[in-house]
Regions:
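Hydrophobic/aromatic ligand-binding patch that stacks against planar heteroaromatic rings
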Residues: 49-50, 80, 106, 137-141
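Catalytic core of membrane glycerolipid acyltransferases/transacylases, capturing the structured
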Residues: 31-94
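Helix-to-loop junction immediately C-terminal to a conserved catalytic motif
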Residues: 9-41
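A cross-family acyltransferase "interaction/gating" segment
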Residues: 29, 124-186
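A short, acidic/glycine-rich surface segment
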Residues: 45-46, 67-72, 99, 155-162
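Alpha-helical membrane-targeting segments
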Residues: 1-20, 70-85, 163-167
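Catalytic-site beta-strand/loop segments enriched in glycine and acidic/polar residues
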Residues: 105-135
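Short gly/ser/thr-rich secondary-structure transition/capping motifs
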Residues: 16-23, 97-98, 154-156
Length: 186
């Protein structure tokens, strides 16, 4: 409920009016059924603009610190991320992240969209970092297609390490779905 309130009433309309994001390839995202949206990660704004361009809900993994930070800021972060249905991920190592992958499987089993940043962190210089194996493992274990997503310009809207950015039109490009099981032997 909180997710839809944010997307269609509170934050979404403001972002659509102020930034007018450019969208390409949204038809590659299925109208129903599960899919993994694997995106680059340029800024905090990525997880706002990508779902904003789709009619369906997108659930993301978010670093566990957003759910455990002490103080008033931490309380607001926890309420916001929990209320919007995001999944905490412990990024300290592969075994620590298993809980998030299990949660992702449950989300995909329910026929939902799951968003993930294969790099595991935001890029501070705009370059694409080496991806982690979680996306491939998730796709192979579930048989769900991976839709590559390029989010563009959010590093200008919300630059890493700065409080304010520039008003520009961010872009979101969805690529055709990939079946990672193709080409694998029996």
């Amino acid at each position: 409920m909180f997710y839809w309130l944010l997307k269609w009433i509170a934050i979404g309309p403001v972002l659509r009016i102020l930034f007018r994001p450019v969208v390409e390839g949204a038809d590659h995202v299925p109208e129903e059924g599960p899919a993994i949206l694997a995106s680059n990660h340029l800024s905090y704004a990525d997880w706002l603009f990508m779902p904003l361009t789709l009619a369906r809900r997108v659930t993301f993994v978010a670093k566990a610190e957003y759910f455990t930070t002490p103080g008033i800021k931490g309380w607001f972060q926890k309420k916001f991320f929990s209320g919007s249905g995001q999944v905490p991920i412990d990024r300290s190592g592969a075994s620590a992240a298993e809980g998030a992958l299990s949660a992702a499987k449950r989300i995909l089993d329910q026929g939902e969209l799951f968003g993930i940043y294969p790099e595991g962190t935001r890029s501070h210089d705009g370059r694409l970092y080496r991806g982690k194996t979680g996306v491939a493992r998730l796709a192979l274990e579930t048989g769900v297609p991976v839709i590559p997503v390029a989010v563009l310009g959010t590093d200008v809207v919300s630059p890493p390490g700065k409080k304010f950015g520039t008003f520009t039109r961010p872009g979101v490009r969805f690529g055709p779905p990939l079946d990672l099981r193709k080409g694998l032997g029996p």
